[in-house]
């Protein structure tokens, strides 16, 4: 489960940004329910962001039981999805959450997948320059937060991202299929399901802005172009004033 802040938003909500209807679900969480949760960058209550110019083999994190405290801090979209799958299939479910608010898709792509795009400058990966903006630097989030996970067996991917790529929707139309193809290749298990969320109906640029609408069109086309993929629209569950919709359940 990856993406930017709309994937990261926990069941307990952000500061002054609650999630609707989660209090009862959090309170009723119990370890006997076979849902387990792992969030990269989070361990022992500490939050340390990890990124790298080169792929790393390990990342900080720990598997957590299904308890009220743990559930309150896990990604809401991820948890609702895991809860649904567990109830319907009656099997143990594990979710791995790797997110960073405000991140561009380029940061989540491997060097191999992004190299064909000549307009993207990869020179910082080969020099001594400091990475000052990891969320917009190609490959560094893949290297630090996805590469260490590729030895895990997974059954599919959830993706909630795109707001930070509104400035170049045409490029995004090519980047996203390359990103998905590379993820599937890295895990080597065929066309694993890839489900993603269309960006929220936030008033990004005012009434005359069109970049968000164009990005949504691109996401719709990507769903058609990427095999074994699906897209959830959020146009009817969001709000133009809040970039993080309070209704997380409807997304799933």
Named regions from a protein language model:
Residues 1-250:
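Cell-envelope and extracellular/periplasmic
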């Amino acid at each position: 489960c990856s993406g930017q802040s709309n994937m990261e938003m926990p069941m307990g909500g952000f500061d002054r940004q609650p999630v609707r209807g989660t209090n009862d679900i959090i309170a009723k969480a119990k370890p006997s329910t076979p849902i387990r949760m792992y969030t990269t960058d989070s361990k022992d209550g500490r939050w340390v962001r990890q990124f790298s110019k080169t792929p790393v083999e390990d990342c900080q994190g720990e598997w957590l039981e299904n308890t009220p405290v743990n559930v309150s801090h896990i990604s809401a979209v991820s948890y609702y999805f895991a809860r649904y799958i567990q109830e319907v299939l009656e099997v143990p479910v594990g979710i791995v959450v790797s997110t960073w608010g405000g991140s561009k898709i380029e940061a989540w792509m491997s060097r191999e997948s992004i190299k064909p795009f000549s307009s993207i400058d990869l020179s910082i990966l080969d020099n001594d320059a400091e990475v000052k903006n990891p969320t917009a630097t190609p490959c560094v989030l893949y290297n630090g937060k996805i590469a260490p996970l590729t030895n895990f067996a997974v059954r599919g991917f959830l993706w909630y991202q795109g707001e930070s790529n509104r400035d170049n929707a045409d490029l995004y139309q090519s980047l996203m299929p390359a990103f998905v193809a590379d993820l599937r290749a890295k895990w080597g298990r065929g066309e694993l399901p890839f489900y993603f969320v269309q960006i929220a109906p936030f008033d990004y640029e005012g009434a005359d802005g069109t970049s968000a609408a164009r990005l949504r069109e691109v996401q719709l086309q990507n769903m058609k172009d990427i095999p074994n993929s699906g897209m959830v629209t959020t146009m009817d569950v969001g709000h133009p004033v809040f970039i993080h919709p309070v209704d997380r359940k409807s997304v799933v």
